[in-house]
A protein has these predicted regions:
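Conserved two-metal-ion catalytic palm core of "right-hand" nucleic acid polymerases
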Residues: 1-130
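Glycine- and acidic
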Residues: 71, 123-134, 168-174, 239
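An acidic- and aromatic-residue-enriched active-site/binding cleft used to recognize and process polar
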Residues: 78-81, 167-171, 176-179, 202-205, ...
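Active-site palm subdomain of RNA-directed nucleic acid polymerases
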Residues: 102, 137-168, 173-176, 181
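C-terminal polymerase-core module
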Residues: 182-239
Length: 239
């Protein structure tokens, strides 16, 4: 019942318009590219097939392209992303932190979403349910907000030569100066802490072999074995 209620709130005309504008704002910085927004197939392919195709083009293939412009790749993800998400940060993302803190009633969309998710979890403010497209969407709102805050932090540090690809809670940070990569990781960590999340130190790594690091091991092995199926992609990887 609460799930349906939440869907109804979000899809109301004015609320949906507000959320669409929100995502446009989050995507203003072209140096931080979120590629985990669900894709709707406009062809005969299923939505899932289109999503997989988009994943390859937007992450792995784009990473290979960026290897031509950047010398270092830093990778990390978020520890227990959904389980640690602070529900009040949903309201901060939708309304701004100052507005959400000053107006705490349910007249605001952000507060309505926050309250509904708390109700799903017996009043808990830490974590959101997993396993649904709706919760993936809610997570993207909060992580888009983090992208926006990270942009502000990076600008204050006057770092300009970088590119970030984010697939939900997985980050790939491309830089030419390794010090910039370390600084961006630190700034990301600081902004995540603000919403109750933490960088996963066990999965944080950096490499100067950008191409090899950009491709999953099983795929890398497949592409390096001679075959005629994907000659263009093989050539791009092996040159």
């Amino acid at each position: 019942v609460l799930y349906v209620y939440l869907v109804n709130i979000i899809t109301q005309k004015d609320n949906w318009s507000k959320i669409r504008k929100l995502f446009k704002r989050f995507q203003k910085n072209k140096k931080i590219n979120c590629v985990s927004i669900p894709v709707k197939s406009l062809t005969k392919k299923s939505d899932k097939a289109e999503q997989i195709s988009n994943w390859w083009k937007s992450i792995e293939q784009k990473s290979i392209e960026l290897a031509l412009d950047f010398d270092y790749l830093f990778e990390t993800d978020i520890s227990d992303c959904y389980g640690s998400l602070y529900t009040h940060s949903i309201a901060w993302a939708i309304e701004s932190k100052s507005v959400a803190k000053s107006i705490k009633n349910n007249s605001l969309l952000g507060n309505q979403v926050d309250s509904a998710i708390q109700s799903m979890q017996y009043g808990q403010t830490n974590g959101i349910p997993q396993g649904s497209v709706l919760m993936d969407f809610i997570a993207e709102i909060v992580l888009g907000y983090v992208d926006e805050q990270l942009t502000k932090s990076i600008n204050l540090e006057k770092i300009s030569n970088y590119q970030i690809i984010r697939y939900r809670d997985d980050y790939r940070i491309f830089v030419n100066n390794p010090n910039d990569g370390s600084k961006i990781l630190k700034l990301l960590s600081e902004n995540l802490i603000e919403i109750g999340m933490r960088v996963n130190n066990a999965k944080t790594k950096d490499s100067s072999d950008v191409i090899t690091s950009s491709i999953k091991a099983d795929k890398l092995e497949r592409y390096l074995i001679p075959t005629t199926k994907n000659p263009a992609q093989q050539y791009l990887i092996t040159i």
